Swiss-Prot record:
Annotated residues for binding of [4Fe-4S] cluster: C18, C24, C27, C99
GO biological process, alphabetically ordered: rRNA base methylation
Pfam family, one: tRNA_U5-meth_tr
InterPro entries assigned to the protein according to its UniProt record, in alphabetical order: MeTrfase_TrmA_AS, MeTrfase_TrmA_CS, rRNA_Ade_Mease_Trfase_CS, SAM-dependent_MTases_sf, U5_MeTrfase_fam
Protein name: Uncharacterized RNA methyltransferase Bd2056
GO molecular function: 4 iron, 4 sulfur cluster binding; metal ion binding; rRNA (adenine-N6,N6-)-dimethyltransferase activity; rRNA (uridine-C5-)-methyltransferase activity
Protein family: Belongs to the class I-like SAM-binding methyltransferase superfamily. RNA M5U methyltransferase family.
Length: 388
């Protein structure tokens, strides 16, 4: 069993300075001792579970990778020459040169990026640093501004010397043809990393893809998933919301088979590429994964009784109608265990009510504080079906 105690032990008196507090809306608790922040998140989750009449193990535990400098991706905006995040007091961008949330590598990328003089009034950007330190940039502008950027050429040339660039909602890649830039189809590259116990697994995706915010904090999440799955024998696992496979791989390290369900085609292409790129010593594992594309929130065609466990990481809206087929099964036909991960505990609490009605009880729960200095947090819960 992995030892999570080191992540439960942190300096509760630590405070993180920020030159933009209290004007920046990115962080809500800058200056508050870190131990108080952790306790507030415990109180918040306890309150949600209690109000929903969901039974949970006490005391709740917080796993932390640190109070600051965790993020390896940053989403921010351009407004009238200012690059940063929205202010707390009005809908206006606050110009930000440094941020206590950013990893040193990402802070370095932000500092270089800010040297670009943008000829547009508005825009949105994502900066990303990959597991090997590679830099990525996603640019989202109005269509007319994208054309201007392609025609201007110099800014794109400068950016491509520093980073891999994607443009627009369709994540197109600008390619120089010899006399102009053309937008080509999205490309999959290694922008994130999962773990199978202590073995890193490269995840292929786009700069604009959804991932967890931090390489460091994500290792904690993967370790928890691996620890929980391997406790059960003959695990035929069904995963909902697999995305690019961040949770698929730690689950696969302990499971007999995984059916990965996801609606986004680009994400599933990335997962398939990641499976195909496994080292030779692990290549046999890809045959234990089946990929299934479908909107699981609306209609589930899979039979829950064919699986020993469920792994769910739904969007903010929660599982919605996904749990309906579970109710129609006899108790002994339902999967033995259910792992639920969520960054939106309000919808998680609603879903846990249904799972409790289906005979599941929470065995363990962790708050993973990968969003320090903010109200947000990740929750991982392990539920087990009560035996008849």
């Amino acid at each position: 069993m992995p030892n999570f105690q080191k992540f439960e032990t942190f300096d509760k008196l630590t405070t993180v300075p920020c030159p933009y507090a209290p004007d920046c809306g990115g962080c809500q608790h800058i200056g508050v001792p870190y131990g108080h922040q952790a306790q507030n998140k415990i109180n918040d989750l306890s309150g949600l579970f209690t109000a929903a009449e969901v039974a949970f193990p006490k005391p709740l535990k917080v796993l932390s990778a640190g109070p600051a400098h965790l993020r390896d991706r940053l989403d921010f905006s351009l407004q009238d020459g200012r690059l940063g995040l929205y202010r707390t007091d009005r809908h206006e961008i606050l110009d930000i040169e440094v941020c206590a949330q950013l990893s040193p590598a990402l802070q370095g990328w932000l500092s270089e990026f800010r040297k670009i003089q943008w000829p547009f009034k508005r825009g949105s950007f994502r900066l990303r640093v990959g597991p090997e330190g590679q830099r990525g940039l996603w640019i989202d502008l109005a269509n007319v501004d994208i054309k201007t950027l392609l025609d201007e050429q110099n800014i794109l040339r400068s950016l491509q010397q520093q980073a891999f660039v994607e443009i627009g909602q369709r994540r197109k890649v600008p390619v120089w043809t010899g006399n102009e830039f053309k937008l080509r189809d999205p490309e999959h590259h290694v922008w994130f990393q999962s773990w199978m116990n202590d073995i890193p697994v490269n995840l292929y995706c786009q700069v604009a893809s959804f991932t967890q915010p931090s390489h460091t904090a994500n290792k904690i999440i993967c370790d928890v998933i691996y620890d929980w799955v391997k406790r059960y024998k003959a695990q035929r696992l069904i995963e909902f919301g697999s995305g690019i496979g961040n949770l698929t791989f730690p689950a696969l390290a302990g499971a007999e088979s995984v059916l990965a369900c996801e609606i986004d085609e680009l994400s599933l292409q990335g997962l398939e590429r990641s499976l195909n790129e496994l080292p030779a010593s692990m290549s046999h594992l890809k045959d234990r994964v089946t990929i299934y594309r479908r909107d699981f929130q609306k209609k589930l065609t899979q039979d829950f009784s064919q699986f020993d466990g469920v792994l769910a990481n739904p969007p903010r809206s929660g599982l919605m109608g996904f749990l309906n087929p579970l109710k129609s099964l006899a108790p002994e036909q339902r999967p033995e265990f259910f792992i639920y991960m969520s960054c939106y505990p309000e919808s998680m609490a609603r879903d846990l009510v249904t799972l409790q009605e289906c005979g599941y009880r929470m065995q363990e729960v962790y708050i993973v504080d990968q969003f320090p200095q903010t109200d947000h947090y990740e929750v991982l819960g392990l539920l087990q079906r009560e035996k008849a």
